Design a protein with these regions (language model features):
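N-terminal "pre-motor" subdomain/linker immediately upstream of P-loop NTPase catalytic cores
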Residues: 1-124
C-alpha cells in the first residue's frame, strides 16, 4: 500500500488531492499526517487499522501542511494552537464531509482528516 510521489516535480496541491482521493477510494475513515523530525508520516485508517501510506520529506512538509489548512478553512499563520476545519468533497456524485483537525507537536502540526460518508449510515 506504500505510495511514492515525485516530490521535486509534482505540485503540493496535486499530492494532497491524490492522498485524499486515493484514501477515499480505499475506503479509509481517517488520514493521519504525523510530523516527524525529518518529514511527515502519512497513514490511513481502513476498517479500524492504521496503514502506512507514504513519507513526506522535510522539504515539502511546510507546504503540505499549509495546503491542507487552506482547503479546510484554517488559519495558516497559527501553528501553536489546535484548530478545526472542514472540506466539502464531491466523489462520484455523492457528498462527503471531511473534518480536519490540527494539533501542535514538537515536530510540527499533526493533522487528521476524518472522512464522513453519510450515504453509508444506517437508514431507517
Amino acid at each position: 500500500m506504500f505510495r511514492e510521489f515525485d516530490y521535486d516535480n509534482k505540485p503540493v496541491v496535486e499530492i494532497v488531492n491524490e492522498i485524499i482521493e486515493d484514501s477515499i477510494k480505499k475506503g479509509a475513515s481517517d488520514i493521519h499526517f504525523d510530523p516527524e523530525e525529518k518529514g511527515i508520516n502519512v497513514r490511513i485508517r481502513i476498517d479500524g487499522e492504521l496503514h502506512d501510506y507514504c513519507k513526506i520529506p522535510e522539504s515539502v512538509k511546510k507546504n503540505l501542511t499549509t495546503r491542507v489548512k487552506i482547503i479546510s478553512g484554517m488559519n495558516i499563520t497559527e501553528s501553536r494552537l489546535p484548530q478545526d476545519g472542514a472540506i466539502k468533497h464531491l466523489d462520484d456524485g455523492k457528498q462527503l464531509d471531511l473534518r480536519v483537525s490540527s494539533l501542535p507537536t514538537i515536530h510540527g502540526e499533526k493533522i487528521v482528516i476524518r472522512i464522513l460518508d453519510y450515504s453509508m449510515s444506517l437508514a431507517g
